[in-house]
Regions:
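Motif-centric detector for short Cys/His coordination patterns
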Residues: 1-88
Length: 88
């Protein structure tokens, strides 16, 4: 008889977002921080084209699993920031 046991894993969430120049910094719930030069990442061109005011107006989606910029009507999921493959 096979018995399956549930494996509980905690999904990493975004806790805070900040910008320094052309770098996006995302603080994660496990205390790591991801930093990306958004002007050099092809799938973040929409963020590179935004004004500093538009970039500053962000919100965390419920649970912190995504970041959304209402002025840009765009966002990203934390799992994509952690993935080595870029979003198409």
């Amino acid at each position: 008889m096979n018995i399956l046991t549930a494996k509980t894993t905690e999904q990493v969430r975004a806790k805070n977002v900040r910008f320094t120049g052309n770098v996006l910094h995302v603080l994660l719930s496990d205390r790591r921080e991801i930093s990306l030069q958004f002007n050099e990442v092809p799938w973040l061109k929409w963020l590179a084209k935004a004004t500093p005011k538009q970039r500053a107006n962000w919100s965390l989606e419920p649970g912190g699993f995504a970041i959304y910029w209402p002025d840009l009507d765009d966002g990203m999921e934390v799992c994509h920031l952690l993935d080595t493959q870029p979003i198409a």
